[in-house]
A protein has these predicted regions:
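Sec-dependent bacterial lipoprotein signal peptides
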Residues: 1-3
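Carbohydrate-active catalytic/glycan-binding domains of CAZyme proteins
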Residues: 5-334
Length: 334
């Protein structure tokens, strides 16, 4: 049931005898987008094979030729178990980015067997971010540097995304989580040329306490949420740089936006968080892809409760990015 897309069947076998196939003991399935259950969904459209690729929590890949029906799950990771990731990490919030002719699978890897302290000194499973590399979008994605943890080992980091500056240097943007520092922050660190190590130390772009719309009103007092997660970098047609992020309002997830004041490559800021959320109603983990006709599409995870069961499904929205700030035009029809 390998999806060819655009008449270009890449074949099931990639180099080293590795096979683009489902996890052991799991059969391939075809799932309609409306029935897909996935936390932290991320979609990438590849013009070379006219195909869509979706990844999410769990680390597996789904493939589609039309956005409506998806074939999967495929196991695309071949990480080095001797690295800090270990043999059985919990994988969340993956993204796939192309840079320098290669594909990079960036994700949060959690080690339930390794503890770090939270803000109160209580033990918390170690959680950090790393990039894996492949020559093909379908993998296999392999460890770049087994001896590098990339980020500070004691830091609870999650939700990595990718950026490039005007000199071609690459960066990881991620969150230092509020459970540990009490005020979640969006941070940036420069990659080495192969994206396997960091160059220098990370610095803060903006923090949860700058987000004035988040949190709850308790006893007449506004209590802001320390949650700041799922950053995603974008640039408008007017060359203004922004970052999507997720926080909470009234106990539900919502998506916000921050803009830099220094143009297309304004990583250093200053950053200003918009006074109102971009999207509310239990939505989070926003990202953007460009469709075959140039349409900019917002991908979010929509959380809903049915019969006491919490489910998250991908939702797509059409974006207008032609001015200095992005706007949602409505649900994306495909």
């Amino acid at each position: 049931m390998l999806v060819a897309c655009g008449g270009n069947d890449k074949g099931a076998v990639q180099g080293d005898g590795w096979t683009f196939s489902p996890p052991a003991g799991v059969a391939l399935d075809t799932v309609l987008m409306d029935d897909m259950e996935m936390n932290n969904p991320f979609i990438r459209y590849e013009r070379e094979d006219d195909c869509y690729y979706m990844v999410g929590d769990g680390g597996y890949m789904w493939v589609s030729s039309n956005l409506r029906s998806w074939v999967g799950p495929y196991d695309v990771l071949c990480q080095d178990t001797a690295s800090w990731i270990g043999a059985e990490p919990v994988i969340t919030s993956p993204e796939i980015h192309k840079f320098g002719g290669k594909y990079y699978y960036m994700a949060t890897f959690e080690r339930p067997d390794v503890m770090v302290p939270d803000a109160e000194g209580r033990p918390f499973a170690r959680r950090s971010c790393v990039a894996l590399v492949a020559d093909d979008i379908r993998g296999p994605y392999r460890t770049i540097d087994r001896g590098s943890s990339l980020l500070v080992e004691s830091e609870m980091a999650a939700h990595p995304t990718f950026g490039v500056d005007h000199l071609g240097a690459s960066y990881m943007i991620y969150t230092h989580q509020g459970e540990q520092n009490g005020d979640g922050t969006v941070q940036i660190v420069r990659f080495s040329d192969d994206l396997g190590r960091r160059v220098g130390e990370a610095y803060i772009m903006f923090s949860a306490d700058e987000n004035q719309w988040s949190g709850n009103v308790v006893d007449g007092e506004r209590r802001f949420s320390p949650v700041m997660e799922a950053p995603f970098l974008f640039i408008t047609d007017e060359k203004e740089m922004g970052i999507l992020f997720t926080s909470y309002i009234g106990g539900e997830k919502a998506i916000g936006v921050a803009y830099t004041q220094t143009g297309e490559y304004g990583y250093n800021g200053p950053w200003t968080v918009e006074q109102q959320p971009l999207l509310t109603g239990g939505v989070g983990s926003a990202s953007i892809f460009t469709d075959y006709d140039g349409t900019k599409v917002l991908v979010v995870g929509k959380v809903a409760v049915a019969d006491g069961i919490v489910k998250c499904r991908p939702q797509l929205f059409k974006l207008d990015m032609q001015f200095d700030k992005l706007k949602i035009e409505g649900h994306y029809k495909f």
